[in-house]
Amino acid sequence: MRTERATRKILIAGGGFGTAFIRYMAQLTGKPRPRLLYLPTASADRDASALNWFKACAPLNVEAHVQNMFIASTSQALGWDEVLLSMDGIVASGGNTLNQQAIWKAQGIDVLLRQAWDRGIVLGGASAGSLCWFDEGTTDSRPKVLSTVQCLGFIPGSHSPHYDAEPGRRPLYQKLIGSGEMKPGYACDNDAGIYFEETAVKRVVHTRPAAKCYYVSRVDGKVVERTLEPEAI
């Protein structure tokens, strides 16, 4: 007998995954009071990052959780799988994507996140928390200059967060795609985001009227930036 697989869902933002985005994620779970987990790995498990998460969740009918990576077996009784796979949604924090990826892979979190995605647990985040789901993208995770980073590869192609907020993002992203050094992909302004079902764009959203998303590709040797007009959430 054939078993129907759950729809895989990812909700990203270019920067700023606040109450409106969390509310939308909660709706995507289909649960009346969803369990939402925050992974502040990219922000080095800073207390301030977790505090902001709880503040953003406070107006919503959700059960908010945080899972740090800097833990010890003497203080954490539950395994990573018991925590992550018991959730309805998982949000990755902003911060250092390169370090985030290294820690997740060392701890086997990358494998569990794919299992969560396959089970229909909604994944998401902004900045490092949006970049992490793609094949690759632009990052400020290294000293001196913007560079590139390889990520989980759940969504094929590349990603640039903070497209309107950091002056170097747009020219570097277009240069890398134009030269063929980076795959075509999606760029998001701060306060704008994309909801993917499976790996296809289902809805483009924003919490600020001027914020937009883009699909950037190379056509006949030239870079083409196509605007994806969002709707307010």
Residue ranges of model-derived segments:
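C-terminal and late-domain segments of enzyme folds
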Residues: 1-33, 43-60, 137-139, 143-233
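Class I SAM-dependent methyltransferase SAM-binding "motif I" and its flanking Rossmann-like core
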Residues: 92-170
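Residue-level marker for well-ordered alpha-helical positions
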Residues: 51, 78, 110-111, 171
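General beta-strand structural signal in soluble alpha/beta enzymes
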Residues: 12, 65-68, 91-92, 123-126, ...
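Portal/gating segments that form or line small-molecule/metal binding sites
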Residues: 37-38, 43-99, 103
